[in-house]
């Protein structure tokens, strides 16, 4: 398994552009859900890499972390000419980074991907470590692989759009990690 670069930044445009430039690719795709399309794409819209990027938008919430949505992402990649040398940027919470990472890891036997988590929970858990997957047959993360992203970019700017529930979910995950240190 390759090493994963985790970058904590405060300038998402510059750092994402740098992470993208470090990857060799022929086509660039950005996976978002309905929420991140509305709230987060405006933060990177003016970046130079966006002129070449193709956006793939999926439904928000964990109910969409399933085989149908995965097949939709694969179909979008295929229909838009993605190759084994394409790059997928997953911009969103844990559902987007899990599903997008799994889609990238299995499309054409694996294409490179970058995770840009936009929720605190995804920043401290889902997007880091190479866990990818989908829910199946009523079970959470039932199908998946370990396949680390080329880079994970964590920018606190995205936290400004979160409601209290999403912040508390992230804090709870942080406390869980902290409690494991003392076992």
What do these predicted ranges mean?
Residues 94:
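Acidic-aromatic/histidine active-site loop/patch
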Residues 97:
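Catalytic nucleophile loop
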